[in-house]
Amino acid sequence: MIEKNYQPADIEARMSVVWEDSLAFKAGRPDRRDAVPFTIVIPPPNVTGSLHMGHALNNTLQDILCRFERMRGRDVLWQPGTDHAGIATQMVVERQLMERQQPGRREMGREKFLERVWQWKAESGDTIINQLKRLGASCDWSRERFTMDEGLSKAVIKVFVELHRDGLIYKDKRLVNWDTKLLTAISDLEVQQTEVKGSLWYLRYPIEGKTFSPEDPSSFIVVATTRPETMLGDTGVAVHPDDERYQKLIGKHVILPLVGRKVEIVADDYSDPEKGSGAVKVTPAHDFNDFEVGNRHGLRRISVLDKEGCLDLLDNEDYLRDLPEGAAQFAEEFNKVDRFVARKRIVERLESFGFVERIEPHTHMVPHGDRSNSVIEPYLTDQWYVDAKTLAKPAIAAVRSGETSFVPKNWEKTYFEWMENIQPWCISRQLWWGHQIPAWYGPDGKVFVAETEEEAISHALGYYVEQEVITAEQGREMALDRNKREGFITRDEDVLDTWFSSALWPFSTLGWPEDAPEVQRYYPTNALVTGFDIIFFWVARMMMMGLHFMKEVPFSTIYIHALVRDEKGAKMSKSKGNVIDPLHLIDEYGADALRFTLAAMAAQGRDIKLATSRVEGYRNFATKLWNASRFAEMNHCAVPEGFEPAKAKETLNRWIAHESAHTTREVTEAIEAYRFNDAAGAIYRFVWNVYCDWYVELAKPVLLGPDSPAKDETRAMVAWARDEILKLLHPFMPFITEELWEVTAKRDGLLALAAWPLKPAEPTPEQLAMFAAAAGPTDPLISPALIVPIFDHADFTDPKAEAEIGWVIDLVTQIRSVRAEMNIPPATLTALVLAGASAETRERAPRWTDVIKRMARLSDISFADRAPDGAVQLLVRGEVAALPLKGVIDVAAERTRLDKEIGKADADIKRAESKLANEKFVANAAEEVVEEEREKREAALARKAKLLEALERLKQAS
């Protein structure tokens, strides 16, 4: 029996247990062993994470696909798991140690600290997984993986060793994003560009061989910089090759102020003649663009900062080389001074010598670490790299050939732009938590890469015996006695970038590199659902690794969803205070309401503007379904054994079967095409408008009337249509549908494993002709009816039934619309005249007279050859229906009211258009504010159009 009130929390708790106990989501179930597999790997959330709105959207869409395919009979594997999240996790544990006033990481040592991290993971690492379960994610939780699991770690080590063997992993000295607080390289994804109000310093660099004078422009070149402290590492000045001002200076030198180093003037397209002086300082060791300029011209790379962001000058051979006498004194004075303190002091020193031409206020973007919030330094250091350019070629080809496709397709352009300009991938991190790099160093720094330390020792001993560094006898002794080789080789302390292990996720989670049957069955996966922000960092790298090691693409389709923003379109952020917590929404409205909201708003390529009111609205939608199901139960509606909708005799029942078939097709095709919003919209309209508002209302006289064959058939059809709704709605709202499936009838199994409704076949030409004849003529000027005739047919489709019920609905809908437009009070009944009605209308109208009168608030329905004077005329499926309003409303007063409302709409339109015509407003206002004005204008235009239509109708009645 269905409870009186819909209580989402109780249902969600109960259904979660039912699904778990029944192993409903287990891949490879005995009843699916021969089924076609369908695989999705979850984008593994950070083990430190908590469910945010992006997770909620991403996992709702994945779950819709998985539940849909499971109901279609597929053997579904939705592979769950979490990412070890190197920096984030290490920071969480370090912060915890600090808060508890316990020894820090350095004091504990690596081994003890890692034990503590694993302890934290055991205690707190399931938070995000439990939250995903609350959302209703139908993953195979028995297969949950963690990127630091033993099996996945084995895959990581094997991939590193093989790529190194093939020359695709190597060590190099290049610039990285360096976090001076965390003391590690970080990825581009972990860098946030923050707008900062700073300064632009214009500096005078004296030309070699000329006597410098601030009053003599021919004695110096002016360069501009936002980071004066890095000038100590300048090794060049770049000018554009076509800039006539500097033609004679190319190849000559300037003398670096304060330092005295000779710096070459080079010609390079990087310099923009239109910006500033047209000359730029080149600091290859402290700027990514300068690094490339330096490579093109063979300029020295002089790093002048240490890992903590302090000047590093005194023991810096690169810096001190070829400097004039007296430079050491400057180095001693500024050595180990913090970069920002040094900036101020260097500028003061430059000003004292006349080397500063001017200083301008300058607002610019400065990179910050997303976790430490410290200013990121481009830092020259030895790191491990992947030859991404080589690995990218097959990944580019796979998308170009269509082997893997993006949805929406426009994301392919983004993918190609990045992949075709890909840079070496820095994969080493100066952390303790993560996959330690499988590389060992011999006494002379020689690198030995191996899967195990024993293997590395073997390689090292063989090498040093061959090089005659040790004797063969020493080699044998060291091989046999661990004590004798203690400390002979030392392991690289760095760990791998988190994205390295994540790149293997589609196959490492299945058991690779072991010959696991799951690899054969579930790889490649079918689809990947993810956000656009990790196309480069994760999607592209999975493509590269999958093709290299599995020789197949990891997924055939990549669906890229948009962002979830606040209701005004602003990006959610803690600083703005506009973050919406999905768990709060689940507590308040239920997981089903949140899921349906996100799906209904997930239009391809369009960000979601999430308002709490929308979630509340879809909770009301769930309540309406609940109440409709209770109504069916109270009226003893049930599907008898052997019931066939195709054999229904009542027109109303054949109509709902037709609409159900049409909706099945709409929902099925929309999900197949990743048009989640269209699928949600179709099922919403069917439940709320077709089933609840029309079918149940039209069926009430039969259900509440005396027993009859028609009543028995209607009871069966009400229950059958409800069951079809539960099936179609289940991927979107799994909890309420599973609950109603269980309590409305005795079932053989779970709704989660029930068969998806069949999609109807295309109509035959004969059926099309029959439908056209039944529908009658149409007028393109009339607004579309609530129920649009669709040429979709299953065995039970009846175009004649659709034409008849569609006529009733169109008629009632248009009458209600006119009553609302004309401000006719609900208690006031009006007459209806069917003018010049066809024989078919004269035949069908009496069957529905009582229903139409009740639903349209009519006093009488009559027939006439023409519409009476003073009546508003409606065109319903090509025929005239007239509402005589003489004496019903005060026409003059209503016209005055409408004119006033039109004036208000005009004022709103003018106000919005004035703002939108203001170029300064459009250029400077926040994007969401501009969009809000556009929406106001469109709403006012639509309101005015309806008011004008009402005014036109009023003229008919006067």
UniProtKB/Swiss-Prot annotation:
Coiled-coil regions, chain positions: 892-958
'HIGH' region, short sequence motif: residues: 45-55
Protein location: Cytoplasm
Top enzyme class: ligase
Short motif ('KMSKS' region): ranges: 571-575
Enzyme Commission number, as recorded: 6.1.1.9
Catalysed reaction equations from the record: tRNA(Val) + L-valine + ATP = L-valyl-tRNA(Val) + AMP + diphosphate
Keyword line: Aminoacyl-tRNA synthetase, ATP-binding, Coiled coil, Cytoplasm, Ligase, Nucleotide-binding, Protein biosynthesis
Pfam families per UniProt: Anticodon_1 (PF08264), tRNA-synt_1 (PF00133), Val_tRNA-synt_C (PF10458)
Residues reported to bind ATP: K574
A GO term for molecular function: ATP binding
Gene Ontology annotations for the cellular component aspect, listed alphabetically: cytosol
One example of a Gene Ontology biological process annotation: valyl-tRNA aminoacylation
Function, as annotated: Catalyzes the attachment of valine to tRNA(Val). As ValRS can inadvertently accommodate and process structurally similar amino acids such as threonine, to avoid such errors, it has a 'posttransfer' editing activity that hydrolyzes mischarged Thr-tRNA(Val) in a tRNA-dependent manner.
Entry text on domains: ValRS has two distinct active sites: one for aminoacylation and one for editing. The misactivated threonine is translocated from the active site to the editing site. The C-terminal coiled-coil domain is crucial for aminoacylation activity.
Complex formation: Monomer.
Family affiliation: Belongs to the class-I aminoacyl-tRNA synthetase family. ValS type 1 subfamily.
This protein's name: Valine--tRNA ligase
